[in-house]
């Protein structure tokens, strides 16, 4: 086929998976002909795999406060947050700290 793919892994934990069809781990093959950053990834996720209550995951163009984002086990705040450019085989983990009581 010859189309370039950017393969990454998404993981959801501590309740975040409930917003994504209760699937804790997804392997994605994104269009490798464009540059992907976290901002683009969040838009793609909203359009393609976010199945429940997007307001619990997204706030504007970013994740809600209370959603931790780790890229290859590193806090995304150290990597540039929305501007981080995804690399092949990156692992992006979303952890919800929002729990009812």
UniProtKB/Swiss-Prot annotation:
GO terms for cellular component: cytosol. It is found in: Cytoplasm. One of its GO terms (biological process) is protein urmylation. InterPro entries: Beta-grasp_dom_sf, Mopterin_synth/thiamin_S_b, Urm1. SUPFAM superfamilies: MoaD/ThiS. Its main location: cytoplasm. Pathway: tRNA modification; 5-methoxycarbonylmethyl-2-thiouridine-tRNA biosynthesis. The modification 1-thioglycine is found at residue 101. C-terminal thiocarboxylation occurs in 2 steps, it is first acyl-adenylated (-COAMP) via the hesA/moeB/thiF part of the MOCS3 homolog, then thiocarboxylated (-COSH) via the rhodanese domain of the MOCS3 homolog. Coiled coil: none annotated. It holds the Pfam family Urm1. There is a cross-link at residue 101 (Glycyl lysine isopeptide (Gly-Lys) (interchain with K-? in acceptor proteins)). Keywords: Cytoplasm, Isopeptide bond, tRNA processing, Ubl conjugation pathway. Interacts with cer. Belongs to the URM1 family. Acts as a sulfur carrier required for 2-thiolation of mcm(5)S(2)U at tRNA wobble positions of cytosolic tRNA(Lys), tRNA(Glu) and tRNA(Gln). Serves as sulfur donor in tRNA 2-thiolation reaction by being thiocarboxylated (-COSH) at its C-terminus by MOCS3. The sulfur is then transferred to tRNA to form 2-thiolation of mcm(5)S(2)U. Also acts as a ubiquitin-like protein (UBL) that is covalently conjugated via an isopeptide bond to lysine residues of target proteins such as Prx2/Jafrac1, Ciao1, Eip71CD and GILT1. HAMAP family: Urm1. This is Ubiquitin-related modifier 1 homolog. The gene is Urm1.
């Amino acid at each position: 086929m010859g189309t370039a793919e950017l393969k990454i892994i998404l993981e959801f934990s501590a309740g975040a998976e409930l917003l994504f069809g209760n699937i804790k781990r997804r392997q994605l093959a994104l269009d490798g002909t464009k540059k992907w950053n976290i901002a683009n990834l969040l838009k793609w996720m909203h359009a393609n795999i976010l199945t429940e209550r997007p307001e619990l995951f997204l706030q504007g163009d970013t994740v809600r406060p209370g959603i931790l984002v780790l890229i290859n086990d590193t806090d995304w705040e150290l990597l540039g947050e929305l501007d981080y450019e995804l690399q092949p085989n990156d692992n992006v983990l979303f952890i919800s700290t929002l729990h009812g009581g």
